[in-house]
């Protein structure tokens, strides 16, 4: 490919809405362009990198016996209603109606569609296990699309589904896929960690995430340096000791707290510490309102709450919904005297005394409220977001924290979907049973962004060789110099015959602009054909190095050096 023919519009400045480096650099380097919030076009450079990521994923999936298919993006509501997820999935599901007023969704995931496809075809245990996958677009109506490709409304994903006749068979495929994902991540060139994860709206009883390290990641990682335990803050259980107040219970009082709503404001106004305040958070689910109580200095884990009340549709109530239902603004809601609401409290609440809670009246809070006397939760469970310095749930050592980007997740689904959809087979004893299933996702477009978050410098992107849009670029310093043009073309043809993915920058622009574009786009290797050609030399420079080396302008010598440089190239190391 010649740069003069390549559609790669580079920019000096990032778009104003670029909050993270991957968004800024992919936009500036001519990989993506925004169509609407969370919706992007992939330009030729992006397509080349995405295709290479897909090829790595496809190869490893095929090697463990998975078979590729292509499923429809548009899915009828009936399938999702069968499993209950039409309502449970939440507002992130993109729903639409056809001209006949029939409900459909643009698939955020494909459990129902895959199960529906095989349910009438797989009849016997002899046809199991079966592992199918696809690579294609997914859709989620993010409430606030941001961070470029990291939280988009449309994204590219590999999703796979396996069908089994035993837990042992599922476990074997699950481990095979986990190992394949390790190989994929290493071939792509990311530094990563595997952690225990929550199953969320997908369901199942076991899940793991592959998370690439990045300071802007939305995944909060927790790790124990002593025993090796790792998880994210959605999944990690709290195993610390709860503080037990030994105070004498005081009389409860309703105090005027004008326009004081947040925990911080309440603590300052009443001159109390945050751990003497109980936050009351209202959620709406299938069965109405749920109130969650958590200590004021801790964050609530909504995933734990969803599991406890068995309702994945649970969402935080809007201010107008709270006001309409209780005639009380958010910020003054509390558990004292509230009716027809299921109240779930964090386990630590039962040991607190003389706490501050919302007064169920605008501009009022209760002080000295006590569990059992003034309010009684319907149930207790662990609702805390586990934080760095909390004890490890395995060995008790303090946990350390870091940030990361989830690039893949695998699930043991069990029989959740097969039971709901009556997807049955006959086992070796003649008994009819539901399939045991697994699910295996990989974010293709998200991976491209994760690479940039991890591998960049002040000049641009540093692509790993395996996924770079081109492995190297030949830069012709002067397009007007016939000798440079002829030699560069000769070198270009030679590299093409060696099956090197090469781009020839033949544009008639300044050398400085060419060098800046090469660094911005992030080609692993640059060969400069310039003035030194008159001395019989060309210059080779790795993207991760500040130094270039001169090599004799003989094709055999150039090939020998560049192959060695490409083999040794490691974008994680600066040399």
From Swiss-Prot:
Keywords: Aminoacyl-tRNA synthetase, ATP-binding, Cytoplasm, Ligase, Nucleotide-binding, Protein biosynthesis
GO biological process terms, semicolon-separated: prolyl-tRNA aminoacylation
SUPFAM superfamilies reported for this sequence: Class II aaRS ABD-related, Class II aaRS and biotin synthetases, YbaK/ProRS associated domain
Keyword Cytoplasm listed: yes
PROSITE patterns found in the cross-reference section: AA_TRNA_LIGASE_II (PS50862)
GO cellular component: cytosol
Record-linked InterPro entries: aa-tRNA-synt_IIb, aa-tRNA-synth_II, aa-tRNA-synth_II/BPL/LPL, Anticodon-bd, Anticodon-bd_dom_sf, Pro-tRNA-ligase_IIa, Pro-tRNA-synth_IIa_bac-type, Pro-tRNA-Synthase_IIa_type1
Catalytic activity: tRNA(Pro) + L-proline + ATP = L-prolyl-tRNA(Pro) + AMP + diphosphate
Domain comment, as recorded: Consists of three domains: the N-terminal catalytic domain, the editing domain and the C-terminal anticodon-binding domain.
Family, per entry: Belongs to the class-II aminoacyl-tRNA synthetase family. ProS type 1 subfamily.
Function noted in UniProt: Catalyzes the attachment of proline to tRNA(Pro) in a two-step reaction: proline is first activated by ATP to form Pro-AMP and then transferred to the acceptor end of tRNA(Pro). As ProRS can inadvertently accommodate and process non-cognate amino acids such as alanine and cysteine, to avoid such errors it has two additional distinct editing activities against alanine. One activity is designated as 'pretransfer' editing and involves the tRNA(Pro)-independent hydrolysis of activated Ala-AMP.
Protein name: Proline--tRNA ligase
Organism (species): Pseudothermotoga lettingae (strain ATCC BAA-301 / DSM 14385 / NBRC 107922 / TMO)
């Amino acid at each position: 490919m010649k740069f003069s023919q390549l559609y790669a519009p580079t920019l000096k400045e990032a778009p104003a809405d670029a909050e993270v480096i991957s968004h800024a650099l992919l936009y500036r380097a001519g990989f993506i362009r925004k169509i609407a919030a969370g919706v992007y076009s992939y330009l030729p450079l992006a397509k080349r990198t995405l295709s290479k990521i897909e090829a790595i994923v496809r190869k490893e999936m095929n090697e463990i016996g998975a078979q590729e298919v292509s499923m429809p993006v548009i899915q009828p509501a009936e399938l999702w209603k069968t499993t209950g997820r039409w309502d449970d999935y939440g507002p992130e599901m993109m729903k639409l109606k056809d001209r006949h007023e029939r409900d459909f969704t643009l698939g955020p995931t494909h459990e129902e569609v895959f199960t529906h496809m095989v349910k009438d075809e797989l009849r016997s245990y002899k046809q199991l296990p079966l592992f199918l996958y696809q690579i294609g677009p997914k859709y989620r109506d993010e409430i606030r699309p941001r961070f470029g490709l990291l939280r988009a409304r449309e994204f590219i994903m590999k999703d796979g589904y396996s069908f089994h006749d035993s837990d042992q068979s599922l476990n074997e495929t699950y481990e095979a896929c986990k190992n394949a994902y390790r190989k994929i991540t290493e071939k792509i060139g990311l530094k990563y960690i595997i952690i225990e994860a929550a199953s969320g709206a997908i369901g199942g009883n076991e899940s793991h995430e592959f998370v690439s390290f990045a300071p802007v990641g939305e995944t909060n990682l927790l790790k124990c340096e002593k025993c090796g335990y790792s998880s994210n803050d959605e999944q990690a259980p709290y195993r610390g000791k709860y503080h037990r107040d030994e105070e004498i219970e005081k009389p409860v009082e309703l105090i005027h707290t004008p326009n004081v709503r947040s925990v911080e404001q309440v603590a300052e106004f009443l001159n109390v510490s945050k751990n003497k305040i109980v936050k009351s958070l209202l959620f709406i689910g299938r069965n109405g309102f749920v109130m969650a109580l958590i200590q004021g200095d801790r964050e609530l884990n909504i995933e734990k709450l969803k599991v406890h009340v068995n309702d994945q549709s649970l969402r935080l109530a809007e201010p107008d919904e709270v006001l309409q239902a209780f005639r009380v603004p958010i910020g003054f809601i509390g558990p004292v005297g509230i009716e027809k609401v299921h109240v779930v409290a964090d386990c630590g609440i039962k040991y607190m005394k003389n706490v501050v809670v919302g007064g169920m009246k605008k501009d009022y809070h209760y002080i000295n409220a006590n569990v059992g006397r003034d309010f009684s939760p319907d149930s207790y469970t662990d609702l805390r977001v586990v934080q760095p310095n909390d004890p490890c749930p395995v060995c008790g050592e303090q946990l350390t924290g870091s940030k990361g980007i989830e690039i893949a997740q695998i699930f043991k689904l069990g029989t959740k979907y097969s039971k709901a959809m009556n997807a049955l087979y006959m086992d070796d004893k003649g008994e009819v049973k539901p399939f045991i299933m697994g699910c295996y996702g990989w974010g293709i477009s998200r991976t491209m962004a994760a690479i940039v978050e991890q591998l960049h410098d002040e000049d641009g992107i540093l692509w790993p060789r395996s996924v770079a849009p081109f492995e190297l670029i030949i830069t012709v310093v002067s397009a007007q110099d016939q000798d440079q043009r002829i030699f560069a073309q000769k070198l270009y043809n030679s590299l093409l015959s060696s099956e090197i993915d090469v781009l020839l920058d033949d544009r008639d622009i300044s050398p400085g602009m060419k060098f800046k574009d090469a660094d911005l786009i992030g080609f692993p290797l640059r060969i400069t054909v310039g003035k030194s050609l008159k001395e019989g030399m060309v210059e080779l420079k790795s993207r991760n190095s500040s130094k270039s080396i001169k090599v004799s302008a003989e094709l055999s010598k150039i090939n020998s050096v560049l192959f060695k440089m490409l083999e040794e190239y490691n974008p994680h190391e600066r040399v």
